Structure formats: structure tokens, C-alpha cells
Amino acid sequence: AMFEAIGVMTKKELEARNEVKWETYTKKIQIEARVLGDLAMNHIIPVATQYQTDLINNVYKMQSLFPADKAARLSAKNLELIEEIADRTAFIKEHVDAMIEARKVANKIESEREKAIAYHDTIVPALEEIRYHIDKLELIVDNQMWTLPKYRELLFVSCLLYTSDAAD
């Protein structure tokens, strides 16, 4: 009413502006969800599973080289990592699938405002949960195997760029 009273925007223009903002928000979350799902399924889970396989092979080799009690002691950490990788990759897969289904439901909503709310309430929390487990896998998987830049590498590059900009 205030915008209309001073001739800035009509109610219809204000509603249209909000509609665009809601649609933009939804599109950004859609893109983020698709990219995260793709990265999780096509990069992160395969790399984590390969590392897990390497750990399993290491455990079997320890068992063939050492007496049972020593092999168990030497392999304990690897067995913990194997289980953690299995738990985290299963969680990621289940939640990526659930997120895809939640997106399908949200995408059927006609109102851009209601669709944005659905994305905020269901998709964003799923993204955060998936991301948490991916971050934990990033810390576990061998650096040589991890195909994506790690946070510390991005931070280091960012710091280098920042310091070189400051020097110029």
C-alpha cells in the first residue's frame, strides 16, 4: 500500500517482483541439489568405495601376514574406517534418492511461493545432511584418490590469491 501511495510500485508489480524472487530462489536450490546429487553419485561414492576396497585388501593382507591377535590390533583402525565409509556412503545414497523424490513433489506445486517454501523446508535440510557426510568422507579418503579439490586446498588457493592481490 505504501509503494502504491507514493507511486513507486503497484500491488501487481510488487507481487510480480516477489514471484520472480521466489522462482530465482527455487532455481538456485534446484541447481545446487542436482549438482550435489551428481557429485555424490558419480564422484564421491565411487572414490570412497574404492578407498574402502583398498582398506579391505589391506586388512586381508594383514590377516595373512600376522598372527590373528596382532592382525586384529593392526587392522582395528582400518576396520573402523571401512565401517564408517560404508555407513556414510549408504546414508548419502539414501538421502540423495529421497532428495530427488522430494524435488519431484515440490516441482508439482503451482505457486512459486509455496514451491520456494517446500524447497526451503525439505530440499535445503537434505542438502545440508548430505553435505555433512560428504565433508566427513573428504577427511577420510586418501588425498591421492579424492578427485575433487578439498576445502583446505581451496582455502590455500584463496589465501594465495588474496595475498597476491594485496601485494599488487
Go through each PLM region and give its residues.
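Conserved small/polar residues in nucleotide/adenosyl-binding loops
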Residues: 162-168
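C-terminal amphipathic alpha-helical interaction region
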Residues: 1-160
